């Protein structure tokens, strides 16, 4: 894990550690997300945030959760600010079937030259795979991505 990844986590990922951990998938995704966040905290990787993330997070009805999620984002080293460029790219992505927020997150991740955009939303991952040739960022599930980049015993 020597590469310096630039990582954009969507709101689903940022909320995952605070979800009820009753299902195996949720627990495993949480572990992967916490490991990713830890690598960002130590400076091994770079966490990216955006105005779009903050706007969506602030729509969360639970004030305590908002504060917890924003606390995670406070370690971000790069912040993407919205601008005219965002509107045009969001419109392009919405024509492909992305929701407004998903399109804005993808556009923000692209703008920041993110290496990876992580989401626990299976529908968004599938849509992104369908249109991967038209996106400037890879979109993946955090557990699947983290499992791919962890060095295996043979790599050591």
Residue ranges and their predicted role:
Residues 1-6, 21-30, 110-156:
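Acidic, PIN/NYN-like endoribonuclease modules and their adjacent C-terminal/linker elements
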Residues 33-38, 69-70, 106:
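Short amphipathic alpha-helical segments and helix-helix/interface helices
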Residues 55-56, 85-89, 142-150:
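A short acidic, often aromatic-flanked loop/helix-cap motif at beta-alpha or helix-coil junctions
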Residues 59-74:
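Short, electropositive alpha-helical surface patch
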């Amino acid at each position: 894990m020597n590469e310096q990844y630039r990582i954009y986590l969507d709101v689903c990922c940022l909320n995952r550690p605070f979800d009820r951990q009753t299902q195996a998938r949720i627990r495993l995704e949480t572990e992967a997300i916490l490991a990713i966040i830890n690598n960002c905290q130590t400076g091994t990787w770079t966490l990216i945030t955006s105005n779009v993330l903050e706007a969506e997070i602030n729509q969360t009805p639970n004030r305590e959760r908002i504060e917890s999620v924003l606390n995670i984002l406070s370690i971000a080293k790069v912040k993407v600010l919205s601008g005219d460029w965002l509107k045009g790219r969001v419109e392009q992505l919405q024509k492909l079937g992305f929701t407004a927020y998903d399109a804005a997150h993808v556009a923000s991740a692209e703008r920041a030259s993110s290496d990876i955009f992580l989401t626990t939303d299976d529908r968004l991952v599938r849509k992104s795979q369908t249109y991967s040739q038209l996106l400037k960022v890879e979109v993946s599930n955090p557990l699947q991505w983290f499992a791919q980049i962890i060095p295996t015993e043979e790599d050591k």
